[in-house]
């Protein structure tokens, strides 16, 4: 289909293995020439679905639309791993997903944060949940709620260029420094209060 339509095609594949082997949950990216240019195996939540666990290495591929990267659904809940997307320079992150009503839209919101942290646009197509397309700052460009629409098509144009973000470099350092600062001021206040009561 990619070759026939002259498009980059991103597709999620859940292959059911014969008994005794583990099934695979993976994403495939094909070039307009029909070549498979990226494969990613899901690494998040495999214990629940009994699938082969990916190696937690997130690849990106250079295309005419800039650098593209992809993860699957629950993979987005691991910022320390997803920051590879920001380090790779990917401008667009594809996230095919399958949620359920009770968790919707939590995973979609988390994925928007992964885009902000890594300075990339996000295209999250969700079965049984909220599909979103965002720019690198988290602005919603398009959205579609699977439970409120009969036509499950989301259309939008996302920026292709990566925006600068410190998160891939420093990770959660700012958060930890803020926590330590808060702890310091609480201790200082407590000590000052005890000294003044003497």
How would you describe each model-predicted region?
Residues 1-11, 20-22, 67-155, 174:
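CN hydrolase (nitrilase-like) catalytic-core segments centered on the catalytic cysteine
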Residues 13-15:
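Beta-strand C-termini and the immediately following turn/loop, strongest in propeller blades
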Residues 18-88, 149:
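Active-site catalytic loop in hydrolytic enzyme cores
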Residues 101, 163-164:
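Membrane-proximal extracellular juxtamembrane segment immediately upstream
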Residues 168-193:
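Selective detector of the "anchor" transmembrane alpha-helix that sits immediately C-terminal
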């Amino acid at each position: 289909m990619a070759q026939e339509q002259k498009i980059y095609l991103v597709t999620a594949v859940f292959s059911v293995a014969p008994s005794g082997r583990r099934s695979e949950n993976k994403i495939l990216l094909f070039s307009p020439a029909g070549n498979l240019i990226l494969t990613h195996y899901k690494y998040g939540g495999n214990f629940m679905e009994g699938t082969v666990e990916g190696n937690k290495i997130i690849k990106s591929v250079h295309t005419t639309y800039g650098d593209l990267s992809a993860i699957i659904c629950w993979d987005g809940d691991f910022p320390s791993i997803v920051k590879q997307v920001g380090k790779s320079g990917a401008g667009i992150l594809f996230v095919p997903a399958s949620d359920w009503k009770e968790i919707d839209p939590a995973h979609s919101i988390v994925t928007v944060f992964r885009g902000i942290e890594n300075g990339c646009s996000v295209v999250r197509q969700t079965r049984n949940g909220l599909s979103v397309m965002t720019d690198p700052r988290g602005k919603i460009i398009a959205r579609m709620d699977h439970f409120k629409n009969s036509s499950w098509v989301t259309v939008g144009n996302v920026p292709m260029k990566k925006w600068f973000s410190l998160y891939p470099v420093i990770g959660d350092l700012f958060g930890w420094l803020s926590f330590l600062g808060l702890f310091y001021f609480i201790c200082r206040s407590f000590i000052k209060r005890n000294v003044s009561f003497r």
